[in-house]
Curated annotation (Swiss-Prot):
Monomer. PANTHER family: FE(2+)-TRAFFICKING PROTEIN-RELATED (PTHR36965:SF1). GO terms for cellular component: cytosol. One of its GO terms (molecular function) is iron ion binding. Could be a mediator in iron transactions between iron acquisition and iron-requiring processes, such as synthesis and/or repair of Fe-S clusters in biosynthetic enzymes. InterPro entries: Fe_traffick_prot_YggX (IPR007457), Fe_traffick_prot_YggX_sf (IPR036766). This is Probable Fe(2+)-trafficking protein.
Length: 90
C-alpha cells in the first residue's frame, strides 16, 4: 500500500517513500517530506555530481559535500550547479 505525503520539494501531495532511504535525522525528514518523484530527480542530480566532480563515496569530505547539496536541492529550493554542464534544449 502506498503512502501519500505532502512533498516539500514538489509542493503537492505525492506518493511517499516505501522505507527510509537515508540514515539519521535527514533520512527521517526525507521519508516524511520527499516523494518518490522528487527523490528520483535528486538521484539524477546526484549521479551527475558524482561523475562530473569525480566524487569518491569512500571519502568523508565527498559524502559531506553530497549531503549538503542534497539538503539544498530537496529542502531549500537550490538547483545543483555543475560547471560546464548545459542542459539539453527542448
Amino acid at each position: 500500500m502506498s503512502r501519500t505525503i505532502f512533498c516539500t520539494f514538489l509542493q503537492r501531495d505525492a506518493e511517499g517513500q516505501d522505507f527510509q532511504l537515508y540514515p539519521g535525522e535527514v533520512g527521517k525528514r526525507i521519508y516524511n517530506e520527499i516523494s518518490k518523484e522528487a527523490w528520483a530527480e535528486w538521484m539524477k542530480k546526484q549521479t551527475m555530481l558524482i561523475n562530473e566532480k569525480k566524487l569518491n563515496m569512500m571519502n568523508v569530505d565527498d559524502r559531506k559535500l553530497l549531503e549538503g547539496e542534497m539538503i539544498k536541492f530537496l529542502f531549500e529550493g537550490h538547483d545543483v550547479h555543475i560547471e560546464g554542464y548545459t542542459p539539453p534544449s527542448e
